[in-house]
């Protein structure tokens, strides 16, 4: 928004504080530098990061997110979904977003927090300054929701907000090509993950590859075709049930039906993105 619009809003809403950067001092990619200025200018002790294009699920979104700051909890991981995206790309986005949420929420609930969603996340202000903010990874385009969270989160100080009223939704406007570029950028932060987290995140891909290797082995051994079909059906049903529960909890529609098929696509896509990431580093 233009600065004059923000200043006009600040007169109507005293809680809105406008931070104006006169000179172009942001020499870094991404939004970490302006976020840092906002955090330093914040009056209160609790910081909430949200996407500029995100819409709250209700009028009490902030209240429902902030109520998770109880006891020793200092980091709150929220959820943001996609809306108004038609066609196959919609299912790819939703599946990717859902799987990412299942990973970071599930691991946080099991005592292994490693990231959140930068479009809906909250933390205490003093944590930001304890680790020096984003200064250690300003050179990366991303990192405010994973490298930073990894530095400040523990099993005891981190919680997950699963209340639907605390969710946000985003109208995804990027193209398929832009989405792939963002995923390649995301790989630049992956090397900062703990080895244990990398291993846990790799388990789904490893088990999927082992499953299809098992299916191919059954075919090569000329075992009854019914065994192959039975193995595939069991795998697909279990996967659909798992995604159905997650979709229901997070308010996502129909993605669970296509989860087994989209998973195959992502196995190939992730391999392609890693290769592209390696070529980008060489350049």
Where are each of the predicted segments found?
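Glycine-rich, basic loop-to-helix element that forms the pyrophosphate-binding segment
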Residues: 22-42, 64
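A conserved catalytic-core signature of glycosyltransferases
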Residues: 30, 116-124, 143
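Short aromatic/hydrophobic "clamp" motif used to bind/position activated sugar donors
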Residues: 47
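Acidic donor-binding/catalytic loop of UDP-sugar-dependent glycosyltransferases
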Residues: 52-67
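Catalytic donor/gating beta->alpha subdomain of glycosyltransferases that bind UDP-sugars
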Residues: 69, 75-100, 126-129, 133-197
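A recurrent flexible, glycine/aromatic-enriched loop bordering the glycosyltransferase active site
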Residues: 82, 104-122, 165-168, 194-200
């Amino acid at each position: 928004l233009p600065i004059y619009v923000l200043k006009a809003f600040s007169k109507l809403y005293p809680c809105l504080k406008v931070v104006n950067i006169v000179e172009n001092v942001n020499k870094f990619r991404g939004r970490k530098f302006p976020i840092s200025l906002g955090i330093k200018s914040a009056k209160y002790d609790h910081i909430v990061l949200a996407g500029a294009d995100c819409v709250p699920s209700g009028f009490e979104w902030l209240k429902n997110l902030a109520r998770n700051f109880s006891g020793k909890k200092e980091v709150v991981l929220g959820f943001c979904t996609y809306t108004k995206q038609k066609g196959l790309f919609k299912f790819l986005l939703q599946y990717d977003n859902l799987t990412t949420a299942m990973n970071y929420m599930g691991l946080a609930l099991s005592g292994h927090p490693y990231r959140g969603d930068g479009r809906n996340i909250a933390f205490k202000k003093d944590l930001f300054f304890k680790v020096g903010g984003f200064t250690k990874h300003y050179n990366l385009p991303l990192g405010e929701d994973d490298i930073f969270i990894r530095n400040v989160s523990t099993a005891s100080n981190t919680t997950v907000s699963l209340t639907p009223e605390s969710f946000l939704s985003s109208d995804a406007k990027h193209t398929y090509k832009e989405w792939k570029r963002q995923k390649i950028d995301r790989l630049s932060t992956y090397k900062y993950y703990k080895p244990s987290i990398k291993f846990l995140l790799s388990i789904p891909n490893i088990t999927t590859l082992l499953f299809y290797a098992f299916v191919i082995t059954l075919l090569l051994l000329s075992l009854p075709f019914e065994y192959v079909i039975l193995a595939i059906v069991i795998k697909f049903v279990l996967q659909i049930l798992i995604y159905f529960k997650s979709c229901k909890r997070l308010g996502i529609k129909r993605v669970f039906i296509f989860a087994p098929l989209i998973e195959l696509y992502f196995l190939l896509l992730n391999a392609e993105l890693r290769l592209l990431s390696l070529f980008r580093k060489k350049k």
